[in-house]
Amino acid sequence: MILNKILNFGIDKNYFIKKPIKQIKKSCCSLEEEIIDFDSTKEIICKEANQQTRKSCDGLCLKGSINFIEFKSLNNFFEKEFQYKLNQENIEEIEIIKEKVRNFNFKRKITDSLWLLDYILRHKDLSLKNNEIDECESIEKNYFIIKDEFQPLINLISNLNLLANESNNLKYRKIMDIEIKNSLDVLIKIELNKPKLIDCKQLEQILKEEK
C-alpha cells in the first residue's frame, strides 16, 4: 500500500520518528500506540527546505488513512491559565475561553501540516508514479483534536474550593468543546474530512480500527 511506502521512506530519510503517544511532547494521553512525532518532522523539513518555522500538528499516523493528531490538555488550561486570568484580569469567562481557542490556531496548523506532508510526497527520492499520487490523494485525511478527560477532583486535597466550583468547571469545559468544534467547522475542505474533537479513548479505538 502507498502509505507503507511513504512511511518507510520517511523513516529511512529520518523525516519520521515514531514514538508511543504518551511520549509525544504535548500528549495528554497515556497510550502505548506509536505515531509519528510530527513536530520533529516539521523541524527537520523546515531546516532542509530553508523555511521559516512552520506550525504543525503534534502527531501523524499513516495506517489505513492519513491522520493528523493535535493534543490539547484542557484540564491543565482550566486548572492554571483559566483560573489565573479569572482572578487577575477583568475578563468574562466566555471571552477567556474564546481567546484560548483562537490561539490554538487550528487552521494554520493543519495547513502547514498538509504542506509538510506534500513536501515528502514530492521528494525526488520517493519518486511516486502518477497512479501512486492519485492513490494517495484518494486516501482519507483526518484531523483529530484530542482532549483529556474532565477531572473534576483534580488537586482536591490541596484546594477544597474546587469542590464548590466543580459544576462550573464542567460547564466551562462544555463551552470550550463547543468553541473548539465551531472553530473546526470552518476548516472543512475537499482533501480533508470534517475535523473532530475526541478524547483519548476514542483515539485509541480509531487507531485500533485502522488497517
Residue ranges of each PLM-predicted region?
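Conserved catalytic cores of phosphodiester-cleaving nucleases, focusing on short active-site segments
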Residues: 59-61, 65-73, 113
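Basic, amphipathic N-terminal segments that precede the first structured/catalytic domain
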Residues: 1-54, 204-211
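Catalytic micro-motifs at enzyme active sites that drive phosphoryl/nucleotidyl and oxygen chemistry
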Residues: 47-50, 57-58, 126-134
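Short, low-complexity, polybasic intrinsically disordered segments
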Residues: 132-207
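Catalytic cores of nucleic-acid endonucleases
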Residues: 74-152
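Generic recognition of cysteine residues
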Residues: 28-29, 46, 57, 61, ...
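Generic alpha-helix structural propensity
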Residues: 54-55, 108
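Residue-level detector of short, conserved catalytic/binding motifs and their immediate flanks
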Residues: 55-57, 67, 141
